[in-house]
Regions:
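Sec/Tat signal peptide C-region and signal peptidase I cleavage site
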Residues: 14-18
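Subset of outer-membrane beta-barrel
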Residues: 19-265
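Sec-dependent N-terminal signal peptides
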Residues: 3-13
């Protein structure tokens, strides 16, 4: 019974919704926050069909702390608008966010987008919930056949107390090189407040399976990790381990609605 429970929880954990190759996660063994079009909304501009995605994320292996995400994208002509609702936390601590995104494809190699989110935080002992907001522009371009450059920034008004909110600014620059049909190499730089974090790693792809390895060079606590993804019948399964974050796992489901994307003349 114990092993059966572990197997069930393994299947129902983190969010790794299956994606096209151009929007696949650049995260390497859970050491990167630059991932997919749920984060950097500019990637959603490349979608060809309406997509509905559902996923569950477990931050630590078999822990209470988890996140549920519902995401839907509507591509039309060169413009894609998306909506996301996510709930993070456990019974005594919860963060709820609702996000709307807009992305435009300027050329087949370049897209930009912006998203705005409303944040609501509540914990046991607080009389009322605390709220904030987040604005996040994103951009990506292929400046050579297999060279992808992506930029992403966040401006967050985070609730600290009922009387005080704090503005937090962060920016990410990521470079991805497709070495061949099997191997992708990614490098990322993150700046938040006065902290600088560098990340790098690689992904090895074999049809529906991919292996990720990488390292994070943080000023105080460097870390390394590895993980894998499996895509099958519009499901996506993922698990990864990071030396500073522990083991995380995920399950995602994506439904494509077979409408054709029409382009304005």
């Amino acid at each position: 019974m114990k092993y059966y429970l572990v197997a069930v929880l393994f299947m129902f954990s983190l969010v790794a919704v299956s994606q096209e190759k151009s929007t696949r996660s650049q995260s390497m063994g859970s050491v990167s926050v630059y991932d997919d079009y749920h984060t950097n909304c500019s990637f959603s501009a490349s979608l060809e069909q309406t997509e509905v995605c559902l996923g569950y994320h477990n931050s630590f292996f078999l822990s209470e702390l988890g996140e549920t995400i519902i995401h839907i994208s509507f591509p039309k002509a060169n413009l894609t608008h998306s909506y996301t609702v996510s709930v993070f936390g456990y019974s005594d601590y919860n963060d709820i966010s609702a996000k709307a995104s807009l992305a435009r494809m300027f050329t087949p190699r370049m897209s930009a987008g912006i998203s705005a989110a409303y944040l609501l935080h509540h914990h046991v002992g607080a009389e009322d919930g605390m709220s904030g907001f987040c604005v996040a522009p994103g951009f990506y371009c292929y400046f050579a056949e297999d060279n992808l450059l992506a930029c992403y920034a966040e401006i967050r008004n985070e609730p600290k107390t009922h009387e005080k909110n704090e503005f937090v600014y962060s920016a990410f620059v990521a470079y991805n090189l497709t070495i061949n049909s099997y191997v992708d190499w990614a490098t990322e730089i993150e700046v938040e407040k006065n902290e600088f974090i560098g990340r790098m790693g690689f992904r090895y792809n074999i049809e529906k399976f991919s292996l990720r390895c990488g390292a994070s060079l943080m000023p105080i606590r460097p870390s390394a990790g590895f993980g894998f993804d499996i895509d099958c019948f519009n499901f996506s399964y993922a698990a990864d381990y990071c030396s500073s974050l522990g083991t995380r796992m995920s399950l995602g489901l994506k439904w494509k609605i077979q409408n054709k994307k029409s382009y304005a003349k």
